[in-house]
Amino acid sequence: MEFQKIHFQKAHFLISAPDIRHLDKHLPPESGIEIAFAGRSNAGKSSALNRLTRQKGLARTSKTPGRTQLINVFEIEEGKRLIDLPGYGFAKVPLAMKLKWQKSLGEYLQERESLKGLVVLMDIRQPFKELDQQLIYWAIDADIPVLALLTKADKLKQGARKTTLLKMREEAKNFEGDVQVELFSSLKGIGLEMLEQKVTSWYAQGETPSTALDEISI
């Protein structure tokens, strides 16, 4: 199926918010279409967003895990947004902050009406950790489709990559939801075209019939 081309390189920073309540004030929850990116600290989330948008500095990368503490919103075009959710799972972050982040993530995934797809990024060498699974279950409960990316795929040889991918696809069946598992490497571009196609399809599916008709009639 052909979808309207998305110009990811036009993405620009819109706002940051500490939680869903602040986000709702600036962007009504029913407005537009949002695709969220989430992952453990240093899973390669910021690098993936930068590669997708062809912008090295759009999402700030850091050698210090746990640096992303806010919900960061980027707009590609009016009504189409990418959401950079706080990184999670870093051991040196205080417990109170961990719990706050997890609460913020859960509320966003379960309550944000404009969310139409979730990309979960996991280091291919440490996939489907407990918090990754919790995130995916939250999304499934909210009827949100999930793309699970095994990042840093270039760190493994091709045979090991394929073996891990097949194993993780089998594990993903246990979620009993719409969970697709793929390889990804920001460095080598592995899986980039697939990511573009998936996000584009989510934007298309998230459009209301009236919006789609308006675009056709223009």
UniProtKB/Swiss-Prot annotation:
Binding annotation for Mg(2+): S46, T68
Classification via PROSITE patterns: G_ENGB (PS51706)
Pfam families: MMR_HSR1 (PF01926)
Top-rank taxon: Bacteria
InterPro entries for the chain: G_ENGB_dom (IPR030393), GTP-bd (IPR006073), GTP-bd_ribosome_bio_YsxC (IPR019987), P-loop_NTPase (IPR027417)
A cellular-component GO term for this protein: cytosol
Residues engaged in binding GTP: 39-46, 66-70, 84-87, 151-154, 184-186
Keywords associated with the record: Cell cycle, Cell division, GTP-binding, Magnesium, Metal-binding, Nucleotide-binding, Septation
GO BP annotations listed: division septum assembly
Cofactor section: Mg(2+)
GO MF annotation terms: GTP binding; metal ion binding
Domain EngB-type G positions: 31-205
HAMAP family: GTPase_EngB
Family stated for the protein in its record: Belongs to the TRAFAC class TrmE-Era-EngA-EngB-Septin-like GTPase superfamily. EngB GTPase family.
Function of the molecule: Necessary for normal cell division and for the maintenance of normal septation.
Protein name stated in the entry: Probable GTP-binding protein EngB
Gene name of the record: engB
